[in-house]
Amino acid sequence: MKLLIVEDDKLLQEGLLLALSHEGYACDCAGTAKEADALIGSAHYSLVILDLGLPDDDGLALLSRWRKNNYQHPVLILTARDKVDDRVSGLDVGADDYLAKPFALTELQARVRALIRRNQGSSNSKIQVDNITLDLNNQQVLLDEKPVVLTPKEFAILSRLVLKAGYQVHRELLHQDIYAWNDDPSSNSLEVHIHNLRQKIGKDRIRTLRGFGYLLTKGEQP
């Protein structure tokens, strides 16, 4: 899954990038409203973390434009504006959650997970497809109730496939889930991750849809 961090404080931006990358998210970063607008128009994000005090525009105005342009993905406001009126304004403009600075990193991570679950239509952090159980909160996978060790990118790929089990998933969407815009993945890197996943959960569980992407089988014997 890919996140967009819109924060002009470089030190905080780097801290958020490091913490969320360790959680298994691919992250893009923007320090201005202009940069954020350009990235929003070029990639699919599971969630946006938005600071309000940007150097070239107010974050609320930016969010208002996104909502008017029908950008419906979750937005978490992260700001030093901590008055009740500020929170009400942010939520009324279209934010899905509001967290004031200073904040506990563990709380931010929990809110990110909750917003992504809500957007995916599930309040339960555990999702089961046949003999595969995915725990989004703890980033753990069970196969026949036994733990399977995955890398962060493997977990991100499997998460997308499990959430869309039985349906085809375009390879470009999987690329966006695991790579930031400035990454330079090799042309077959996704295939390598898919190969490794097949070794861990069963080679027939993930089907290749030639010229399109992949599909996780559901409700059938592999």
Curated annotation (Swiss-Prot):
Residues 124-218 bind DNA. Member of the two-component regulatory system PmrB/PmrA involved in regulation of virulence. Unphosphorylated PmrA represses extracellular enzyme genes. Phosphorylation of PmrA by PmrB relieves such repression, which leads to activation of extracellular enzyme genes. Phosphorylated PmrA seems to repress expression of the pmrCAB operon. GO terms for cellular component: cytosol; protein-DNA complex. The modification 4-aspartylphosphate is found at D51. One of its GO terms (molecular function) is transcription cis-regulatory region binding. InterPro entries: CheY-like_superfamily, OmpR/PhoB-type_DNA-bd, Sig_transdc_resp-reg_receiver, WalR-like, WH-like_DNA-bd_sf. Pfam families: Response_reg, Trans_reg_C. Signal peptide: none annotated. Its main location: cytoplasm. NCBIfam families: PRK10643.1. CDD domains: REC_OmpR_PmrA-like, trans_reg_C. Residues 2-116 form the Response regulatory domain. GO terms for biological process: regulation of DNA-templated transcription. Keywords: Cytoplasm, DNA-binding, Phosphoprotein, Repressor, Transcription, Transcription regulation, Two-component regulatory system, Virulence. It is found in: Cytoplasm. This is Transcriptional regulatory protein PmrA. Phosphorylated by PmrB. It comes from the Bacteria.
